[in-house]
C-alpha cells in the first residue's frame, strides 16, 4: 500500500481554499499510485483555528467542503483529512478534534484525538472533548486489509517531559498495543521549536519500537499568526530508524510504500507480497509550481532559527494581504537583523526602510544603516525628526510648565518615529515590522506607541544575546549556502562588523548606552530565560547563586512591563515560552 504524505501550508479558516489544496495534493499523489494520502491535523481548517470553531456557519461550510472533496477525489485514492467532528446534543465543548477518510463519493469520521493540549499556546479543551477509545482504520489495498492506528499530534507525546511537566496522564500508544496494527499514523500541527524536530522523531521511534510497526508522521508547515510550523514530516521503521524525511519549512508531497511483510508478526502475509521491500527513503515528488524546497535535511540550529523567522514573516505578510514591508533602520543590530529577515522573506524589492535621525543620532549609525541597505539592495529613505521634536516641545511646554525632559523627552523621539513609520506604512499599504527583541520586551526597555509600533514583532522572541549570536553566524562563511538559498548576498559579511561590535544604544540622549539602564545582556538574559521560560522564582535563582538584588530588580521590571506587552504586536514564537498567547499573566498583580 503506497502512502503519500501531504505537508501543507493552510490558511486558517479558509475551508474552501484548504480543501482545494488538499485535492490538488491528492491528484498528484494518485498519479504516483498512492492508495492513501495523509494531511496534517485540522488540515481543512488550518491550525490553530481558535474561536472560528465556535461559528456554526463554518461547521456547515466544513460539511460542504468535505462533500466537494469527496465528489472530486480520484478513484482508488483516499485521503485522511483533519476536521472538527460535532458531538450531537452536547454542550460546549461540543467537538472532537478528528480525522475523516474521504474517498470518491463519500466521507466518514475514522479517528478522534485523545490527548488535548491545554498549555502554552494550546487551548484545545476550550473547543474539543477527548476521545475515550483508540482509533483503528481498516483499509484494503492490493488484496490485503491493513490495520492502521490513527493518532493526532499530542497522542504521540507520551514519552517525554516538556517544560518541567509530563504532557499527559493517559497513554494512547499503550492502548494500541493490543490492536495488532500494521502501521501507526500521526497527523500533526506541531509548531517550530529549537530541537523539536529531533524530539518528534524520538517520540515516533519510541512508539514504533513499542508497537513493532512503522510510524508515519505528517506535519503542518507555514506561519499562522505568531506560530511557525516547520513541517519536517517523516517515516520511521519498526525499529525506529528514519527511512523518509520531508522538507523543512516548505510544502512537500512524499510517497512511501511499506513492505507487505511489515506489521504485527502474527498476521498472515500473502506469499506473493512477502518479498516486496519498502524503498528506503523514497524520493520526494517534484514540487508543484510555487512550492519551493529549502532542504530535505534538518538544518543546524542557527539556520533553523533564521528559516523559521523567514517563513513566519513571509506567511504573515502573504496571508494578511500585504505586498511589502516597512521598518525603521537605525544602524543597530536589531533592525539590521529584521531587515535581513524581511529581505529573505519578501525579496529586497518589496522591503523599504527609513532612517529617522535625531540630534543624538551618531554619524556612524547613519552610515551603518546606509551600508546595510546597499548590501541588501533595499530602498532606504531618510526623515529627520529634529523639526518634529521642536514642534512637540513648543506644543507641550505650556501644558508642562517647561520643555519635556528626561524619559518624557526620550520617549517623544521614539513616538515621533513610530508615528512616521505608521503613516508611511498606512499610505503605502505595507506591513510595519517592529524590531524590538525579547530582552527589551521582558523588562519594558521599549516605548508604547513608539518603537513598539508595528503589525509583527519579528525578533520579539529572541533575547539580545541570541540576536548577537545569529548575526555573528550570518557574517560567518558557514552561513553562505543558507544565505544564497534565501536570496541574500552570499559573499562577505552581511550584517557587518561595525553593527555587530558597537555597544547597544537607543541614541535618545548624548552618549547613551543600554548598559546605563540595564545589566549587560550576557548577565540579564540568563535570568530572564529562567524567569520567563522556566518560570523559576527569584528565590530559586538566588539559591542557585545569582545576585539577590539583581534578580529582584529584573523580576520587578518583568512584572511591571506586563501592560506594555499586552499592547505589543504578535511576536513570532521560536522559544519554549514566548510573550503572547502562551503568556497569560495579569497586569494588576502583586
Residue ranges of predicted features:
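ATP/NTP-dependent adenylation/nucleotidyl-transfer catalytic domains that generate, transfer
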Residues: 146, 212-213, 238, 262, ...
Amino acid at each position: 500500500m503506497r502512502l503519500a504524505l501531504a505537508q501543507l501550508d493552510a490558511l486558517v479558516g479558509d475551508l474552501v481554499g484548504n480543501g482545494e489544496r488538499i485535492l490538488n495534493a491528492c491528484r498528484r499523489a494518485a498519479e504516483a499510485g498512492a492508495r492513501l494520502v495523509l494531511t496534517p491535523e485540522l488540515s481543512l481548517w488550518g491550525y490553530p483555528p481558535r474561536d472560528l470553531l465556535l461559528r456554526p456557519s463554518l461547521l456547515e461550510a466544513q460539511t460542504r467542503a468535505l462533500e466537494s472533496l469527496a465528489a472530486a477525489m480520484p478513484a482508488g485514492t483516499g485521503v485522511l483529512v483533519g476536521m472538527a467532528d460535532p458531538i450531537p446534543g452536547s454542550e460546549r465543548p461540543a467537538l472532537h478534534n478528528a480525522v475523516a477518510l474521504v474517498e470518491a463519493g463519500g466521507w466518514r469520521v475514522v479517528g478522534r484525538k485523545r490527548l488535548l493540549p491545554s498549555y502554552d499556546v494550546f487551548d484545545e479543551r476550550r473547543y474539543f472533548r477527548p476521545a475515550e477509545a483508540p482509533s483503528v482504520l481498516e483499509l484494503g489495498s492490493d488484496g490485503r486489509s491493513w490495520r492502521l492506528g490513527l493518532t493526532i499530534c499530542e497522542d504521540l507525546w507520551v514519552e517525554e517531559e516538556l517544560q518541567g511537566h509530563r504532557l499527559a496522564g493517559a497513554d494512547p500508544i499503550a492502548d494500541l498495543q493490543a490492536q495488532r496494527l500494521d502501521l501507526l499514523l500521526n497527523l500533526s500541527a506541531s509548531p517550530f521549536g529549537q530541537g523539536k524536530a529531533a524530539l518528534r522523531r524520538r517520540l515516533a521511534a519510541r512508539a514504533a519500537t513499542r508497537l513493532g510497526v512503522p510510524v508515519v508522521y505528517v506535519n503542518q508547515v507555514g506561519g499562522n499568526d505568531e506560530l511557525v510550523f516547520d513541517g519536517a514530516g517523516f517515516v520511521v521503521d519498526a525499529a525506529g530508524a528514519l527511512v523518509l524525511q520531508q522538507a523543512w519549512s516548505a510544502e512537500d508531497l512524499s510517497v512511501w510504500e511499506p513492505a507487505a511483510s511489515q506489521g504485527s508478526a502474527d498476521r498472515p502475509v500473502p506469499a506473493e507480497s512477502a518479498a516486496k521491500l519498502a524503498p528506503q527513503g523514497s524520493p520526494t515528488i517534484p514540487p508543484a509550481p510555487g512550492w519551493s524546497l529549502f532542504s530535505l535535511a534538518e538544518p543546524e540550529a542557527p539556520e533553523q532559527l533564521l528559516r523559521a523567522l523567514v517563513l513566519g514573516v513571509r506567511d504573515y505578510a502573504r496571508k494578511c494581504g500585504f505586498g511589502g514591508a516597512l521598518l525603521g533602520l537605525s544602524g543597530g543590530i536589531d533592525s539590521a537583523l529584521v531587515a535581513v529577515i524581511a529581505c529573505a522573506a519578501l525579496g529586497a524589492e518589496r522591503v523599504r526602510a527609513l532612517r529617522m535621525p535625531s540630534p543624538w543620532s551618531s554619524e556612524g549609525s547613519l552610515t551603518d544603516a546606509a551600508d546595510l541597505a546597499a548590501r541588501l539592495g533595499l530602498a532606504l529613505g531618510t526623515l529627520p525628526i529634529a523639526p518634529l521634536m521642536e514642534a512637540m516641545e513648543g506644543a507641550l511646554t505650556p501644558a508642562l510648565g517647561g520643555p519635556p525632559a528626561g524619559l518624557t523627552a526620550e520617549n517623544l523621539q521614539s513616538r515621533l518615529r513610530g508615528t512616521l513609520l505608521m503613516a508611511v506604512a498606512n499610505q503605502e499599504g505595507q506591513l510595519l515590522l517592529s524590531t524590538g527583541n525579547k530582552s527589551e520586551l521582558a523588562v519594558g526597555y521599549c516605548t508604547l506607541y513608539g518603537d513598539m509600533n508595528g503589525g509583527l514583532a519579528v525578533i520579539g522572541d529572541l533575547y539580545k544575546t541570541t540576536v548577537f549570536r545569529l548575526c555573528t553566524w550570518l557574517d560567518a562563511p558557514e552561513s553562505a549556502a543558507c544565505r544564497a538559498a534565501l536570496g541574500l548576498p552570499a559573499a562577505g559579511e552581511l550584517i557587518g562588523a561595525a553593527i555587530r561590535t558597537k555597544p547597544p544604544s537607543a541614541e535618545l540622549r548624548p552618549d547613551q548606552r543600554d548598559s546605563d539602564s540595564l545589566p549587560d545582556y550576557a548577565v540579564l538574559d540568563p535570568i530572564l530565560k529562567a524567569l520567563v521560560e522556566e518560570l523559576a522564582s527569584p528565590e530559586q535563582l538566588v539559591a542557585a547563586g545569582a545576585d539577590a538584588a539583581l534578580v529582584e530588580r529584573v523580576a520587578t521590571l518583568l512584572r511591571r512591563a506586563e501592560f506594555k506587552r499586552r499592547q505589543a504586536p504578535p511576536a513570532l514564537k521560536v522559544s519554549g515560552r514566548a510573550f503572547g498567547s502562551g503568556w497569560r499573566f495579569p497586569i494588576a498583580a502583586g
